[in-house]
C-alpha cells in the first residue's frame, strides 16, 4: 500500500526537477543573449506576472474549469450511453458509429463560431463545444470496453439465467472500467482545449479570452501565464483521474503493475 504513493512522489519529483531545469535554462538563455521580452519573456517575469495578477488568473481559470467540467460531464455521459447502446446492438453500432465519425472529423475551430452565433455568448456554447470534442474518445473506449467482457464469464452468467441488465452491471461495466478511465484522461484534456477554443471565438471571460487579448496586445507574460495555468489545470486533472483509477481499480493488473 505504501509503494504506490512513494512511486508517485518520485515521479512528481522527477517532473518538477525537469521543469525547474527548463526554467533555469530559459532564464539563463534570455538573460545571456538579451532576448527581447516581446519575443520570449523570461521565466522570472512570467512568475512575477502570475504572482501580481494571481486573483485575475484564478478567477478566469475558475470560469474555464467550469466550462470544461460541464462539457466533460455532458460529453462523456452521452458517449457512455451511446457506447452502451452500440455494444448491445449491431444495428445501433452500424447506425451510430458513422455519426460519431462525422462528429470526430468536424473541425472544432469551424464549429465554435456557429455555436456562438446560434446560442449566444454565454456559458452554454462553451459547454457544448467541450462536450462535442470529448464525445468520440469516450464513445470508443466505452464501446470497446463493454465489448471486452470475458466470453467464458459471459457464458457462465448466461447459464445461470442472468438478465442482460445483470450481465451489463456485473460483468460488462467492471470489464470496461480500465477503458473508461483511459477515455476520461483523454476527454478531460480535450474538454479543456474545447473550452479555450470556444472562448477564443466569443467570450469576455476565461483563460482563452486572456490568451486572445494578450496575443493581440503582444502581452507575452500574460499569454505565457495563462498557458502555464492551463497546463497546471491539465496536470491536476490527470492526477485526479489517476488517483481515482488507482483507488477504484486497485485489484486490476493494469494498476498493480504500474
Where are these regions (language model features)?
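Transmembrane alpha-helices
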Residues: 128-132, 164-198, 224-225, 229, ...
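Short cytoplasmic-facing helical segments at TM-TM junctions of multi-pass membrane proteins
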Residues: 138-186, 207, 211
Amino acid at each position: 500500500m505504501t509503494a504506490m504513493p512513494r512511486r508517485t512522489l518520485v515521479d512528481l519529483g522527477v517532473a518538477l526537477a525537469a521543469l525547474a531545469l527548463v526554467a533555469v535554462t530559459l532564464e539563463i538563455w534570455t538573460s545571456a543573449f538579451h532576448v527581447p521580452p516581446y519575443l520570449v519573456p523570461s521565466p522570472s517575469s512570467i512568475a512575477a506576472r502570475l504572482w501580481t495578477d494571481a486573483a485575475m488568473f484564478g478567477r478566469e481559470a475558475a470560469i474555464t474549469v467550469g466550462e470544461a467540467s460541464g462539457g466533460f460531464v455532458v460529453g462523456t455521459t452521452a458517449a457512455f450511453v451511446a457506447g452502451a447502446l452500440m455494444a448491445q446492438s449491431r444495428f445501433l453500432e452500424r447506425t451510430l458509429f458513422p455519426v460519431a465519425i462525422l462528429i470526430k472529423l468536424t473541425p472544432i475551430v469551424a464549429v465554435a463560431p456557429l455555436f456562438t452565433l446560434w446560442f449566444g455568448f454565454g456559458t452554454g456554447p462553451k459547454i457544448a463545444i467541450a462536450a462535442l470534442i470529448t464525445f468520440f474518445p469516450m464513445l470508443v473506449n466505452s464501446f470497446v470496453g463493454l465489448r471486452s467482457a470475458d466470453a467464458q464469464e459471459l457464458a457462465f452468467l448466461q447459464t445461470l439465467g442472468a438478465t442482460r441488465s445483470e450481465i451489463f452491471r456485473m460483468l460488462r461495466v467492471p470489464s470496461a472500467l480500465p477503458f473508461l478511465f483511459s477515455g476520461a484522461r483523454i476527454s478531460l484534456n480535450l474538454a479543456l482545449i474545447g473550452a479555450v477554443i470556444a472562448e477564443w471565438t466569443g467570450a469576455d471571460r476565461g483563460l482563452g479570452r486572456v490568451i486572445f487579448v494578450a496575443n493581440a496586445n503582444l502581452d507575452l507574460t500574460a499569454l505565457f501565464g495563462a498557458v502555464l495555468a492551463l497546463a497546471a489545470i491539465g496536470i491536476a486533472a490527470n492526477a485526479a483521474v489517476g488517483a481515482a483509477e488507482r483507488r477504484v481499480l486497485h485489484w486490476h493488473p493494469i494498476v498493480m503493475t504500474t
